[in-house]
Amino acid sequence: MFTFYMYLAPIVAGVLIGLNWLLAKSNPNIDKAGPFECGFTSYQQSRAAFSVAFILVAILFLPFDLEISSILPYVTSAYNNGLYGLIILIIFLMMLVIAFILEIQLRVLKIERSYDKDRSDSNYYDHEI
């Protein structure tokens, strides 16, 4: 069965590359055809703006995600670890909860809204052009 998949994987990859080559739109451009060098003239806007709140959520998500994934080995060996492993797990989870409560108290997770609360809909639509 392993030999079958060893032959099948390159065949599927070749078919997909061939389909892409046949069905892809061709949009030749002198900038695309040449080698990439610093300072070339861009033919479209290359940097799109995104919210700072997105970066904040991503930065806060990363440590908690890594810490939660470090709990997974305990799940597979909970029987062998016994009471000592359970106590270590509870201490670890308490540190996570305390860190999360601290972030909430410091208002790190408060994301500002993009609309103005003082502006009502009637004032928004009643101005003259």
Curated annotation (Swiss-Prot):
InterPro entries in the cross-refs: NADH_UbQ/plastoQ_OxRdtase_su3, NDAH_ubi_oxred_su3_sf
UniProt keyword list: Electron transport, Membrane, Mitochondrion, NAD, Respiratory chain, Translocase, Transmembrane, Transmembrane helix, Transport, Ubiquinone
Reaction catalyzed: a ubiquinone + NADH + 5 H(+)(in) = a ubiquinol + NAD(+) + 4 H(+)(out)
Disulfide cross-links: none
Pfam families per record: Oxidored_q4
Localization in the cell: Mitochondrion membrane
Physiological role: Core subunit of the mitochondrial membrane respiratory chain NADH dehydrogenase (Complex I) that is believed to belong to the minimal assembly required for catalysis. Complex I functions in the transfer of electrons from NADH to the respiratory chain. The immediate electron acceptor for the enzyme is believed to be ubiquinone.
Protein name: NADH-ubiquinone oxidoreductase chain 3
Source organism phylogeny: Eukaryota, Fungi, Dikarya, Ascomycota, Saccharomycotina
